[in-house]
Amino acid sequence: MTLKTEPFGNWASPVSAALIAGATIRLGQIALHGSTIAWSEGRPLEQGRNVVVQRSADGTRRDLNPAPFDARTRAHEYGGGAFVLLADGALVFSHYADQQLYRAAPVGAPVALTHGTAMRYADAVPDAVPDTARNRLIAVREDHTHSSIDAVATLVAISLHDGTEQVLASGHDFFSSPRLRPDGRQLAWLTWDHPNMPWDGSTLWLADVAADGTLTGARIVAGGSTESIFQPEWSPAGVLHFASDRTGWWNLYRLNGEGADASAQALCPMDAEFGQAQWVFGMSSYGFDGRGNIVCTFTQAGRSQLARIDAVTLQLQRIATSFCTISDLKVGGDFAAFIGGSDAAPAAVVRIDLVTLGCEVLRSASSSTVDAAFVSRAEAITFPTEGGLAAHALFYAPVNPGFTGPAAELPPLIVMSHGGPTSATTPAFNWGIQYWTTRGFAVVDVNYGGSTGYGRDYRQRLAGQWGVVDVDDAVNAARFLAGRGSVNPARTAIRGGSAGGYTTLCALTFRSFFQCGASHYGIGDLEALARDTHKFESRYLDGLIGPWPAAQALYHARSPINFTERLSSPMILLQGLEDKAVPPAQAQAMFDAVRAKGLAVALLMFEGEQHGFRRAATIQRALEAELYFYGRIFGFTPAGTIEPVAIENL
């Protein structure tokens, strides 16, 4: 193929915004029942509706919740753990529209199981132990009857006969992960309390289950205010396992002994993360095969590994796969299923045979493909940052077999900041990154200090320093790449969503390095966020900024909206009108302030969208609007036809 010389940003790309919006689904929770595998799909072409899909042993696939039923819970606002499979083949799921639990039998329409008016449910497990009268679910319930900011969380038992509910445990701000021992005689669960987030400190509880289904003898067996516990799980032999970061890394442990003599044994101590930041319910990184061995995934140096730990020798054996990210791992007798992402193909639901170790893709997140020659693969970089420390990022060079940039030019750079902020970016194939690299942009996706996957100390770098450390690392990643001659420092943009949007706004306000930026539902006013957010994150800022309202002066000082006189760069803001995590008033206020300053600015508000865009039309419009904006600021004309964006002061 003959290379055509065109300015960076002008390159024609096969990766269109319409392709990304319409052909990409959101893969979520995985569940197993015997040889059956089920998972959730968020479908942009169905207005973001979440569908539970079942794949039987014979390979047939079918939707379990028909339209208009939407299997998504608003518990903790971010949801997760929205469905469970029952022994009789039925599905129980939370319906987004009314947040009630519905039972969908293999034949017939879903029928409401619960009938509350202000309840939300998540993380349900069946409790239908043979030879007992119990036929119920045990789940987390949020009661929003009196207040959403003070919603009451409990563990409840829900009868599968008539939906009646019985409170099993209460008295803490948050509950998650109820896990029943295989014989039904004990229940484990997690709690945490304000101001902690689950990755700061959480507590693992264990109780006996009486014959009448009530809990007795509840006691703490691990965790605390400075130790994070993740995913309690029972082995087939009835031994409780969990992940803890007590050593600085989320490692696996098992509880040996009973009562006061119980002790936690580290199974395979190593500088690796077997746990994750519990942003949603139902997360899973390990399980047990038919021989009682642990099949697990862990993260080292920003990449996921798959492994098996022998139940007797505790020796860890890595399992080679083509996947660099592995999540939602569920384990059956002789197989496992997970969501896997490679560096060259979209994420997929994958089944691995634990005997042959062969992998089968059951469902790809995208029905579209792109020639490998167009794919930019991540280069992991470690770069110097403030305080003599090092930070991490993933660099993607521009790649398009049909084009090259002018000989005397270096590519423009887009610096991406992930959301959370207690989260991480991964090297897995991402259409949203390939959209830019195939058009001639370089991209660096920054795992700034505070990101997960590098141990507790790295995660704690953001304690009290949000808006400082993340911004420093974003700037220093760009400087590092410019210093080695990979990008043009005079044509740099920064973009991010949610917490990444806050990093973007801070960088454009408190630094003068970037020429422009794009904030997707980003935070401009920390004081407003502290006053007007949901319960799960209502004290999150205590750790990231300082206690509210005692540290109000610091909240003011870290809020970009208060210092618009320091702005010197254009920006585009993209916001959902139904966002409860970051109210749209924040985007409007930031837009008004930037416009008054006389800087180029654009604002797009999307009806029906919340915190994160789910509808195909929104996803397409947002991507194209951002590209159009960069074209106007950097002085290039994107290939193809793009609807113009109204840009004030330009």
What are these language model-derived features?
Residues 14-21, 62-73, 109-115, 164-169, ...:
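A short beta-strand motif characteristic of beta-propeller blades
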Residues 41-51, 71-77, 93-101, 115-121, ...:
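A flexible loop/linker signature enriched in serine peptidases of the S9 family
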Residues 195, 365-490, 497, 531, ...:
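Cap/lid segment of the alpha/beta-hydrolase catalytic domain
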Residues 1-36, 42-51:
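Sequence/structural signature of beta-propeller modules
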Residues 26-29, 40-41, 50, 62-63, ...:
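Non-catalytic accessory segments flanking enzyme active sites
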Residues 23-36, 70-91, 118-137, 171-187, ...:
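Conserved beta-propeller blade repeats
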Residues 56-59, 105-108, 159-163, 209-213, ...:
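Short loop/turn segments that connect beta-strands within beta-propeller blades
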Residues 448-650:
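Active-site-proximal cap/loop segments of hydrolase catalytic domains
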